A protein has these predicted regions:
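Generic recognition of long tandem-repeat/solenoid scaffolds
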Residues: 1-5, 10, 55-64, 182, ...
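Acidic-aromatic substrate-binding/catalytic surfaces of carbohydrate-active enzymes
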Residues: 1-49
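Extended, loop-rich substrate-binding clefts of extracytoplasmic carbohydrate-active enzymes
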Residues: 30-84, 91-96, 100
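Glycine-rich (often Gly-Gly/Gly-Pro-rich) flexible segments and glycine-rich loop motifs
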Residues: 120-164
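Acidic (Asp/Glu-rich), glycine- and aromatic
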Residues: 82-138, 244
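Short, surface-exposed beta-strand/loop "edge" segments at domain boundaries and coil↔beta transitions
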Residues: 1-2, 8-20, 65-73, 97-100, ...
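Short, ordered beta-strand-loop transition motifs
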Residues: 49-57, 80-81, 126-128, 186-187, ...
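Beta-strand-rich recognition/accessory modules
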Residues: 152-256
Length: 256
């Protein structure tokens, strides 16, 4: 069973443009060690789905008692007209020891796009360590079919050599993103924009993943502590394509 959004449509007169087959799908929760719980655990256990009594928000709640990782998490989704959904994710760990000696946890979300105009993802970033900020068109490289892009100052995750989720953990050394937003161009002249309230802090970070036709992202927490609350805010926009500068401006407006 998938979590998240079953569909997302943009209506223009009599036309309907669908973004994905499933979106904001929390697919994996993983550690730095080989563990059967690294793969598809969010699909295997029940959620509570609640609607705000006076408001437009929907909450997807996973109780710690229903999580093999003993983590409780809540994703709040709120429509923001005319073309956006605001996302607020919060989590708390009852037993961090389950994540082992590497002491980090990753949450992985997938958006299974229906039809892409361009398989790459686009963001502001640097193409090498000493580069200046520019527009990056990111796609598979260095012989990898897929992989993950890091914030400019982030470090690659260390993981066991026999890990069963290496595909999701490995990352490209370059390019790096310098602003916490990306966009992906879809068929019918549409664009999906994802933006976040952080690049990287001392305890957590956002990562962009390239698994076309999915547009994915990860939230990684380092040094997980018992009962401490973690989380991030984000916005998803689905609208007709104009220019990449307008995508950047959408992030700036949301950030302010």
């Amino acid at each position: 069973v998938l979590s998240g959004l079953q569909s997302l449509s943009y209506l223009d007169a009599d036309e309907r443009f669908e973004a994905f087959r499933a979106g904001l799908n929390l697919e994996h929760v993983y550690s730095g060690h080989r563990d059967d719980r690294n793969r598809f655990v969010p699909r295997r256990h029940p959620y509570l789905v609640c609607r705000e009594r006076e408001g437009r928000s929907v909450f997807m709640v996973r109780l710690a008692s229903q999580s093999p990782w003993s983590v409780e998490h809540v994703m709040r989704l709120t429509p923001s007209p005319p073309d956006s959904i605001d996302i607020d994710f919060r989590c708390r760990f009852l037993d961090p020891s389950r994540f082992g000696a590497r002491e980090y946890v990753g949450f992985f979300w997938a958006n299974y796009m229906r039809e892409l105009h361009d398989a790459a993802i686009h963001f502001r970033g640097v193409s090498d360590e000493d580069g200046t900020e520019e527009w990056i068109r990111a796609e598979s490289r260095d012989g990898w079919d897929v992989g993950t892009y890091l914030a400019a100052d982030a470090s690659a995750l260390e993981f066991d050599t026999d890990h069963n989720m290496i595909l999701n953990l490995r990352s490209f050394s370059t390019p790096r993103f310098t602003r916490p937003f990306l966009f992906s161009r879809s068929a019918n002249n549409m664009v999906l924009i994802l933006m976040f309230d952080r690049l990287q802090t001392g305890i957590d970070e956002i990562r962009f993943s390239h698994f076309p036709p999915a547009v994915d992202f990860q939230y990684v927490i380092h040094g997980v502590e018992t009962e401490r609350r973690y989380g991030f805010r984000a916005r998803m926009i689905w609208r007709p394509w104009t220019t990449r500068e307008e995508c950047l401006q959408a992030w700036r407006s949301w950030q302010s």
